[in-house]
């Protein structure tokens, strides 16, 4: 969900995704690039995300882009997440 959420804001390259998750979570999630790429590959295989190569300065960088199917799945996941949080809050009485 976190990766799709970030890509819903803008196309990003792998290291940028890692840095953004670490930054926004204030260090609560310390995602490593080695953990990220298998997830990205599964998202690509599922048609949720696509990738493209772009030259930035003298470097070739791979950017990831959320597709329509990914946006739809993100919406579903967010609804599921909200339902879970609502249920937990009812149980905890908050």
Residue ranges and their predicted role:
Residues 59-78:
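Basic, amphipathic "hinge/linker" alpha-helix immediately C-terminal to the N-terminal HTH DNA-binding motif
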Residues 1-35:
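N-terminal helix-turn-helix DNA-binding core of bacterial DNA-binding proteins
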Residues 72-94:
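Amphipathic alpha-helical dimerization/coiled-coil segments
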Residues 36-37, 43:
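Basic amphipathic alpha-helical segments that dock to polyanions
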Residues 44-60, 65:
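Beta-hairpin "wing" of winged helix-turn-helix
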């Amino acid at each position: 969900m976190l990766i799709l959420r970030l890509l819903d804001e803008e196309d990003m390259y792998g290291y940028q995704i890692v840095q953004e998750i670490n930054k926004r979570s204030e260090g609560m999630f310390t995602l490593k690039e080695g953990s990220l790429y298998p997830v990205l590959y599964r998202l690509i295989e599922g048609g949720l995300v696509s990738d493209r190569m772009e030259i930035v300065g003298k470097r070739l960088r791979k950017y990831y882009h959320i597709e329509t199917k990914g946006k739809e799945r993100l919406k579903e996941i967010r609804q599921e997440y909200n339902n879970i949080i609502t249920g937990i809050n009812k149980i905890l009485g908050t």
